[in-house]
From Swiss-Prot:
It holds the Pfam family CLP1_N. Keywords: ATP-binding, Kinase, mRNA processing, Nucleotide-binding, Nucleus, Transferase, tRNA processing. Residues 1-25 are annotated as: Disordered. This is Polyribonucleotide 5'-hydroxyl-kinase Clp1. Component of the tRNA splicing endonuclease complex. Component of pre-mRNA cleavage complex II (CF-II). It catalyses: a 5'-end dephospho-2'-deoxyribonucleoside-DNA + ATP = a 5'-end 5'-phospho-2'-deoxyribonucleoside-DNA + ADP + H(+); a 5'-end dephospho-ribonucleoside-RNA + ATP = a 5'-end 5'-phospho-ribonucleoside-RNA + ADP + H(+). It comes from Xenopus tropicalis (Western clawed frog).
């Protein structure tokens, strides 16, 4: 369950047996080829001539890149290029209407802030990206992180979108030091992410816990910046969820305060931009940016499949080259909890306890058949085995309950590491995963 267990496999050689119709696209300067792969067959792309990039990662000429079903990508060129495509994507067209120049100008501004921080011994920009669902927040974060790394920086990606899980699996928040551009096919290398258990794909299920974990991430990031000058100068990009009203909006304000952000980038929603402009401190630079025309709304089914794919990649690797372990553990060998007790009338609460306190309570879960297929976070215990503050401790890894035998009192689990489990507490998620591989 060490950080090595979370690492992604290395790139594999292209499959020369790939077949499908072939199309050549000639892209003029400052245009992009937009792709959506929704069917059952992958699509392959090759840069034949010129220069191009995917969300800030440069493409290597004459190398084939595979985009599996569910992929959405934009191949952008600053100077013009030729791209060969194999397969039948649901969407494939060239667009001149792209916000890339605005995004590049944003990166230039952030780099100027980093250079100034370097000269004056200050900290670099801390950037929060906000906006409703499906406007390209994660893509903008990836783009700006890639550009920063290509300039020699080492920014930190902070993932607060519990429904997506770009740092780890869905149902978590986390942070990742980005040291190299994202792989076109696999994303950022998650060698040693810092991950915390939330347990659900929507912050509203336990907003008290969500805000507490946000504060915890900010505290740990501050400690790292205090001890690592390069990390401090490089700053961070904070990706947020698409819930921007009511408690979701207050969670945005809380995140901005906890991380002491300097810059807020709002995608596509003028009302949110004006609200943040009004409610954030005057020194915070709040910018309204357009979303890309390639950003389209995803259905609930598409989101669910995307979450399943993230969990599958955790256990099997992006290319299916990892081999998780299946083994049994006895009921008596594990302690399983859920963070947050069910709401009860205030009159029934213990004296001095509030509903908010109830949201952070560890509730024991008795192993049973209803645990089947649930994802669980593995939280290591210290030498004394104390369970205080478990909800604020970082996660070592994840397991899935694939079977429950109540007669033999055993659980069958899927784990990235072999038995035995470390001395730990298991925190159950609302998220289920059917291991059909």
């Amino acid at each position: 369950m060490s950080s090595e267990d979370l690492s992604a496999p290395g790139p594999s050689a292209p499959d020369s047996s790939f077949t499908g119709p072939s199309t050549k696209f000639e892209l003029e300067r400052e245009t992009e080829l937009r792709l959506e792969v929704e069917g059952t067959d992958p699509v392959r792309v090759e840069l034949v001539s010129g220069l191009a990039e995917v969300f800030g990662t440069e493409l290597t000429r004459n190398k084939k890149y595979t985009f599996p079903p569910g992929s959405r990508a934009a191949i952008f060129t600053w100077h013009g290029c030729t791209v060969q495509l194999w397969g039948s994507p649901d969407v494939a067209y060239v667009s001149r209407d792209t916000p890339m120049l605005l995004y590049l100008n944003t990166q230039v501004g952030l780099e100027q802030m980093r250079a100034q921080a370097e000269r004056e011994g200050e900290r670099g920009p801390r950037v929060l990206v906000a906006g409703p669902s499906d406007v390209g927040k994660s893509t903008l974060c990836r783009l700006l992180l890639n550009y920063a790394v290509r300039r020699g920086r080492r920014p930190t990606l902070v993932e607060l979108d519990v429904g997506q899980g770009s740092v780890s699996v869905p149902g978590t928040v986390g942070a990742l030091c980005v040291e190299r551009p994202a792989d076109v096919e696999e994303g950022f290398s998650a060698q040693a992410p810092l991950v915390y258990h939330f347990g659900s794909t929507t912050p509203g299920t336990n907003i008290k816990l969500y805000n507490k974990l946000t504060s915890r991430l900010a505290h740990v990031f501050n400690l790292r910046c205090d001890s690592n000058r390069r990390a401090s100068v490089s700053g961070c990009l904070i990706n947020t969820c698409g819930w921007v009203k009511g408690s979701g909006y207050q969670a945005l304000i809380h995140a901005a305060s906890a991380f002491e952000v300097d810059v807020v980038l709002v995608l596509d929603q003028e009302r949110l931009y004006n609200d943040l402009l009004r409610d954030l401190p005057h020194f915070v630079r709040t910018l309204l940016l357009p979303k890309s025309g390639g950003a389209s709304e995803r259905s609930k089914e598409c989101r669910r499949e995307s979450r399943d794919q993230r969990v599958r990649e955790y256990f099997y690797g992006p290319r299916g080259s990892l081999y998780p372990h299946a083994f049994e553990i006895k009921f008596s060998e594990v302690r399983v909890y859920k963070v947050g007790a069910p709401s009860i009338p205030d009159s029934c609460l213990p004296l001095g306890m509030s509903q908010e306190d109830n949201q952070l309570k560890l509730v024991p879960v008795t192993p049973g058949r209803d645990m089947a297929h649930h994802l669980l976070s593995v939280v290591p215990l210290d030498g004394g085995g104390a369970e205080e503050g478990i909800e604020e401790r970082s996660v070592a890894g994840f397991i899935v309950i694939t079977g429950v035998d109540t007669e033999r009192q055993t659980l069958t689990v899927l784990s990235p590491a072999p038995r035995p489990l470390p001395k730990c507490v298991l925190l159950i998620m609302d998220i289920r995963f059917m291991d059909l591989k």
